[in-house]
């Protein structure tokens, strides 16, 4: 492969337009050396082709499977495939340990029963309830049943969980978690590594991945899926380091690219959380699901947006208003500060609106931790103590942290079944897209429904990353012939890249991105109303049209971050459009989607009353259904369709489904 890379770089002068100088000598040296293979394996199928463009020759690769993304879900899928004998490529725009999984703090849920008796069926119940009955119960069944084994697997990989005095994995309380189907009090189900669980999990999975012969393509930006006759046959990507274009042809493609939190101005997401996989699926003409459901984490640091883990409240922290009241007792009398995230975020917003906010502007509340023993803060929340001092100037042992709800997670994503297979909905039935899988925050299985429970996201990563690998291993064999692609496959992607590289309009990428983020922040926030959402739809549609007038400044091809950020903006815009149009269309309040003009859930039955004598509402007249959104990429027009929620479990005798009810904490 090194020879191929050298050959592709020698073609650089052929690619560059006359107005652009040849690459400097420093850029023509060998690739940086890592302690694992980053450029793929040498094989007979790897070759340079000019079938798309003489200016942009393409390096072709052939694999059994390609995984896009190397966070928790991507790594688990990639080494699961390699372990099963598949020739696997992992394409990632970041070095694996820079993926956003590293930022997760609180923990990973599993009914281990280390603190009190627990049962995965209780975890199942809490997750269904937390989803506000929009979650698919077959997928939730699969995830919660697999959870204990997934955590033990991580422990066996060497993940250094916090421990009890008896040496068991320590489990803390987290929001929305109960015992005995909501009747037995607060559950302690969240396994953690102090308050740096995501960091530990990602490094554990990365270390494990080095055991296997996976080909890592690091700092390669995935541009688009390679689709033929409704099947996915790989991806096309840009090597950021040297500007080469690469086509990865594979029988199986797994998308694990994370969320799109950067559609908002204030969020806990990394700057690289740009919905790349979600947008690739959209451009392929496939639907995305439930993008209107965006989780606002209750405790982002005021003015900075940095995450303060729910584990703070799990360890005994409380939220207070300007009057010193523990106000969550009013909104969730039983769970109080450990109600689900959507409930806490709305409660905080109401306190601020009604004039009980803190600070000179009365525009935030306080998270109080200084009543807890300093030793507990030092051992269980060391990262938070440091973060609060750096970003808020607060010593948590002496004063409270100013906090405000901040965009944190996308419940929606690429629709999949519980096996990780991407699906569409045709003529009233779910249809699998051959060769395409998704997992992690990029996917919508849908285990989170309208609202995710804290510490279910890391569980989602490892369970469904593994599920993708298992499904591929069940349906394919290593070394099977890889389907062919057209000689010019990917030419539209390269044409778009070339257009952006030489874009000479009037609007900077940063300006358009800021307009999008501020529109989303002000028009699709914790509380939403029809008129504001409609205005937001109009504004975003105009911003989407403005993308035709972008101006980029770097005309080079080597490490052109201006170009990469513009490609990411295109991806963000597709996600933002589907989010706000889906929110405007959904005329109800459910989970994280709270409409002030439609304050209640609209289900197939009125679950606030006895069901006897009620007639089921027609599918068109209720909202307990998944949104499927499509975008015409040329015009930006959004089309919405809907599919039913799956209420059955994988085995009703083993785990009974949970019928909808009024949701309270």
From Swiss-Prot:
Oxaloacetate binds at residues 297, 309, 408, 452, 455. Belongs to the FAD-dependent oxidoreductase 2 family. FRD/SDH subfamily. The active site is at residue 341. FAD binds at residues 70, 73, 92-93, 99, 101, 106, 222, 276, 441, 457-458. InterPro entries: FAD-dep_OxRdtase_2_FAD-bd, FAD/NAD-bd_sf, FRD_SDH_FAD_BS, Fum_R/Succ_DH_flav-like_C_sf, Fum_Rdtase/Succ_DH_flav-like_C, SdhA/FrdA/AprA, Succ_DH/fumarate_Rdtase_cat_sf, Succ_DH_flav_su_fwd. The gene is SDHA. It catalyses: a ubiquinone + succinate = a ubiquinol + fumarate; (R)-malate + a quinone = enol-oxaloacetate + a quinol; (S)-malate + a quinone = enol-oxaloacetate + a quinol. Residues 1-44 form a transit peptide. Pathway: Carbohydrate metabolism; tricarboxylic acid cycle; fumarate from succinate (eukaryal route): step 1/1. Its EC number is 1.3.5.1, 1.1.5.-. It is found in: Mitochondrion inner membrane. One of its GO terms (molecular function) is succinate dehydrogenase (quinone) activity. Enol-oxaloacetate inhibits the succinate dehydrogenase activity. GO terms for cellular component: mitochondrial inner membrane; respiratory chain complex II (succinate dehydrogenase). This is Succinate dehydrogenase [ubiquinone] flavoprotein subunit, mitochondrial. Its cofactor is FAD. It comes from Gallus gallus. It is a peripheral membrane protein. The modification Tele-8alpha-FAD histidine is found at residue 100. Its main location: mitochondrion. Component of complex II composed of four subunits: the flavoprotein (FP) SDHA, iron-sulfur protein (IP) SDHB, and a cytochrome b560 composed of SDHC and SDHD. GO terms for biological process: mitochondrial electron transport, succinate to ubiquinone; respiratory electron transport chain; succinate metabolic process; tricarboxylic acid cycle. Flavoprotein (FP) subunit of succinate dehydrogenase (SDH) that is involved in complex II of the mitochondrial electron transport chain and is responsible for transferring electrons from succinate to ubiquinone (coenzyme Q). SDH also oxidizes malate to the non-canonical enol form of oxaloacetate, enol-oxaloacetate. Enol-oxaloacetate, which is a potent inhibitor of the succinate dehydrogenase activity, is further isomerized into keto-oxaloacetate. Keywords: Electron transport, FAD, Flavoprotein, Membrane, Mitochondrion, Mitochondrion inner membrane, Oxidoreductase, Transit peptide, Transport, Tricarboxylic acid cycle.
């Amino acid at each position: 492969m090194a020879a191929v890379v050298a050959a592709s770089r020698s073609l650089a002068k052929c690619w560059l337009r006359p107005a652009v100088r040849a690459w400097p000598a420093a850029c023509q040296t060998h690739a940086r050396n890592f302690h694992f293979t980053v450029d793929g394996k040498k094989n007979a199928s790897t070759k340079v082709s000019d079938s798309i463009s003489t200016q942009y020759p393409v390096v072709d690769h052939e694999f059994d499977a390609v995984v896009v993304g190397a966070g928790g879900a991507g790594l688990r899928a990639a080494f699961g495939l390699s372990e099963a004998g598949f020739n696997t490529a992992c394409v990632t725009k970041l070095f694996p340990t820079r993926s956003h999984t590293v930022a997760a703090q609180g923990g990973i849920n599993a009914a281990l029963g280390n603190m009190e008796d627990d049962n995965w069926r209780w975890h199942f119940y809490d997750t269904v309830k937390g989803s506000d009955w929009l979650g698919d119960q077959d997928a939730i069944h699969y995830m919660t049943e697999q959870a204990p084994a997934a955590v033990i697997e991580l422990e066996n990989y060497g993940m250094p969980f916090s421990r009890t005095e008896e040496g068991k994995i320590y489990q803390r309380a987290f929001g929305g978690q109960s015992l005995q189907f909501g009747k037995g009090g607060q559950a302690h189900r969240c396994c953690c590594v102090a308050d740096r669980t995501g960091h530990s999990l990602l490094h554990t999975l990365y270390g494990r991945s080095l055991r296997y012969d996976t080909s890592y393509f690091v700092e390669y930006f995935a541009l688009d899926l390679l689709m033929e006759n409704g099947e996915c046959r790989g991806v096309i990507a840009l090597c950021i380091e040297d500007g080469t274009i690469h086509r990865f042809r594979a029988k199986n493609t797994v998308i694990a690219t994370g969320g799109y939190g950067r559609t908002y101005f204030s969020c806990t997401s990394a700057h690289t959380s740009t919905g790349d996989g979600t947008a690739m699926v959209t451009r392929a003409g496939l639907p995305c699901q439930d993008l209107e459901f965006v989780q606002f984490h209750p405790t982002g640091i005021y003015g900075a947006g940095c995450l303060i883990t729910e584990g703070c409240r799990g360890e005994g922290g409380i939220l207070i208003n300007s009057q010193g009241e523990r106000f969550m007792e009013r909104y969730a009398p039983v769970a109080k500060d450990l109600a689900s995230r959507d409930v806490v975020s709305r409660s905080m917003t109401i306190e601020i609106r009604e004039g009980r906010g803190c600070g000179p502007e009365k525009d935030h509340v306080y998270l109080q931790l200084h009543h807890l023993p300093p030793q507990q803060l030092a051992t269980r929340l060391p990262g938070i103590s440091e973060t609060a001092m750096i970003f808020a100037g607060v010593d948590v042992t002496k004063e409270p942290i100013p906090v405000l709800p901040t965009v944190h997670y996308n419940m929606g994503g690429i629709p999949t079944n519980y096996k990780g297979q991407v699906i569409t909905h045709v003529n009233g039935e779910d249809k699998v897209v051959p060769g395409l899988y998704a997992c992690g925050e990029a996917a919508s299985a849908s285990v989170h429904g309208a609202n995710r429970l804290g510490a279910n996201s890391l569980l989602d990563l490892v369970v469904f990353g593994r599920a993708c690998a298992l499904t591929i291993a069940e349906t394919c064999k290593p070394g099977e012939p890889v389907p062919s692609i057209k000689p010019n496959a990917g030419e539209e992607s390269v044409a778009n890249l070339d257009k952006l590289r030489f874009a000479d309009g009037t609007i900077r990428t940063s300006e358009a991105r800021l307009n999008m983020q501020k529109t989303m922040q002000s028009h699709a926030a914790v509380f939403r109303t029809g008129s504001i959402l409609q205005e937001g739809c109009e504004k975003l549609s105009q911003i989407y049209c403005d993308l035709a007038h972008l101006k980029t400044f770097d005309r080079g091809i080597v490490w052109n971050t201006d170009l990469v950020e513009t490609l990411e903006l295109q991806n963000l815009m597709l996600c933002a459009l589907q989010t706000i149009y889906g929110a405007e269309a959904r005329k109800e309040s459910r989970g994280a989607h709270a409409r002030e003009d439609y304050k209640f859930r609209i289900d197939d039955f009125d679950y606030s009353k006895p069901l006897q004598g009620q007639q089921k509402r027609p599918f068109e007249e209720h909202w307990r259904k998944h949104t499927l959104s499509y975008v015409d990429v040329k015009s930006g027009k959004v089309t919405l369709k809907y599919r039913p929620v799956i209420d059955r479990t994988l085995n009703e005798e083993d785990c009974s489904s949970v019928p909808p009810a009024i949701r309270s904490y």
